[in-house]
Amino acid sequence: MDRSRTSSQGRDVLPPRGDEGRISPSLDKEKSPGPEDQPDAPPDGGLTAWLVVVGAWCTSFCSFGWVNSVGIFQNYYESHLLKHLSSSTISWIPSLQIFFMFAMGPIVGKLYDTFGARYLIIGGTFFHVFGLMMASISTQYYQLLLSQGICSAIGAAAIFQPALSAVSAWFNRKRGIAFATLSTGSSVGGVIFPIMVDRLIAKVGFGWSMRISAFMILFLLGIAIVTVKARRPPPQGPKPSGVQLLQPFKEPVFIVTLLGYMLLTYGVFIPINYVIVQAVASGMNADLASYLVPMLNGASLFGRLGAGFMSDRYGRYNIFIVMCIVAGVLVLALWIPATSNAPIIVFATLFGFASGAYVSLSPALIAQISPLKEVGYRTGLLFLFASVGGLTTSPIAGAILQNAGGDYTHMKIFSGVMLLGGTAFIITARIVGTGLKLVVKY
């Protein structure tokens, strides 16, 4: 891929930027026409554009913010509602949530490219809220699988991805910080939901804690329905052919990025799902352990903002790679030996910060290497590949834990290796796109 970032067929993937090939703009005095010079260039700001980001923030809060709280439900189900079942069996509930949120990607992406964002968000709001309401009256394992693991997750997929794709159309030069800003919604949700649900379960019971959460989500998604919209009407031309749908799989940078992101999914969600359970098993007070996921997600907020800001300056792939390497090293060097309160808390905080780029920069990576009109579909493909990891991460981790007789070391090693292995694929994608150039902004 050359510096103008064209696909193998020579199509324009992203308008060239004058500073694209360098860390410092001053090193490249000859500036090529930027996106602001193009007739249909994204405005990169303005009230409407930032209102789209506000609405997308609400969808992030209600989708990934909710899913980032799965650790609190894993712990509650193991100790109360489903305590007669094994950890590996219970873990299929959060695994299905993650799977359907990601696996619906290509379907939601094509629906967005055809119909725009608003109708998808309306439909997604219904399924997300309805699923949580049904979970509030569930008492059996299969009922929770259907309501929380499938119905709610399908709704969450239909609200989040259209918002991401809509933001891509409104921003180009500031795309990194725009994505980082909206992705902080999942961090804030990941802080608020675990604490809120934990306290509500103690005071009003599991049923009403789910209903109150559903009403809160309904209110925020009402804001998203009003504010999130596409910048241009959906195209009215013929439907894309099979050849066009397969085109992304002919682009090496895109394929390697998909594979890397899938492996990263295995590594990222194991700490999120198991940090509370492992801390309690190591002797941490259950009340203190319940704050670990909020700590992780709170630190992730700053990691996402920092990664987004730095990515616009130094390159999205570059910053994504650095952050993922740090996350993998933290798992292997800090989480494995962590058996007391202090190192576990430090790990949760630092890992939350380092893993923030996994959510905030992944859509920006795809937008960078894709034609704007295909961003929805290609982002969906990214999520589809990630869904494989999302579906199998917790069951694999639970099986590793069970085979090790309750020793968490092997599970932690698996998480760290997947993080570094996925990062190796992303590094390969960067090399394919730029060659062996360390200082290239990419």
Curated annotation (Swiss-Prot):
Main location, first listed in the record: membrane
Pathway assigned to this chain's UniProt record: Secondary metabolite biosynthesis
Domain of life: Eukaryota
Annotated TM spans: 47-67, 89-109, 119-139, 150-170, 177-197, 206-226, 252-272, 288-307, 319-339, 342-362, 381-401, 413-433
Family matches, as CDD domains: MFS_MCT_SLC16
InterPro entries, A to Z: MFS, MFS_dom, MFS_trans_sf, Proton-linked_MCT
Phenotype seen when the gene is deleted: Leads to the production of a mixture of ferriaspergillin analogs with varying combinations of aspergillic acid and hydroxyaspergillic acid.
Polar residues composition bias: residue spans: 1-10
Record Pfam families: MFS_1
Feature: compositional bias, Basic and acidic residues: 17-34
Membrane topology: Multi-pass membrane protein
Record keywords, A-Z: Cell membrane, Membrane, Transmembrane, Transmembrane helix, Transport
The keyword Disulfide bond appears for this protein: no
Subcellular location: Cell membrane
Induction behaviour: Expressed during the earliest stages of maize kernel infection.
Biological function: MFS transporter; part of the gene cluster that mediates the biosynthesis of aspergillic acid. Probably involved in aspergillic acid metabolism and transport.
Name under which the protein is recorded: MFS transporter asaE
Gene designation per UniProt: asaE
